[in-house]
């Protein structure tokens, strides 16, 4: 397969995800397929965003990493010290992705490390490993292109997260401001009673304890639910199950006391 064909295969995958979050596992599998390598896409804090490995590479240590979705902190630091592409790293180098304890098996292995950059900052690392065969110039061009594309996707996800947080904060503020004094007081007591983000509420019990009518509680919950801040489900005589949908709600409620 030519370099152009391999690049197009990567582009096809990204076009398929246009407008929705990219699955980095899919990206890793595509990179693995077109470069014939083992692939790790790692965040700057060492979280494994996506991977695609040959069964031969899976040792106990590698399996533990995949299960925890994190690489060891020491290896993360080594990767973050790499400022530009380092290619054809051998098994004796501490940057190798292959387990040194299996040195005899991977004596001909080669690792290449591509820093993932975006918006003027380091976002993570793309690590490719081959059991044998050096990385050639085409491999490096493709790897650097893949790292650039991954960086753009990470930035897009970050931007989407910031936008979502802003929308959630606005919805929470509007919902709290829509409550009357007694409704706000009722909500504060409800979440004190629940002691967390979700739980079972018996409205009459809270109403009696606080000295407000049950209708105040019902109206307060209805306002929060219509704003998308909470969800509630009646369980009949058992009470009402309540769950917070926007995670910053309780912090904002506390701040508005």
Swiss-Prot record:
Protein name: Global transcriptional regulator CodY
Gene Ontology molecular functions: DNA binding; DNA-binding transcription factor activity; GTP binding
Role: DNA-binding global transcriptional regulator which is involved in the adaptive response to starvation and acts by directly or indirectly controlling the expression of numerous genes in response to nutrient availability. During rapid exponential growth, CodY is highly active and represses genes whose products allow adaptation to nutrient depletion.
Ranges annotated as DNA-binding: 203-222
Protein source organism: Staphylococcus haemolyticus (strain JCSC1435)
Region (GAF domain): 1-155
Localization, UniProt: Cytoplasm
Coiled coil: none
Gene Ontology annotations of biological process type: negative regulation of DNA-templated transcription
UniProtKB keywords: Cytoplasm, DNA-binding, Repressor, Transcription, Transcription regulation
SUPFAM superfamilies: Winged helix' DNA-binding domain
Main location: cytoplasm
Keyword check for Heme: no
GO terms under cellular component: cytoplasm
Sequence similarity: Belongs to the CodY family.
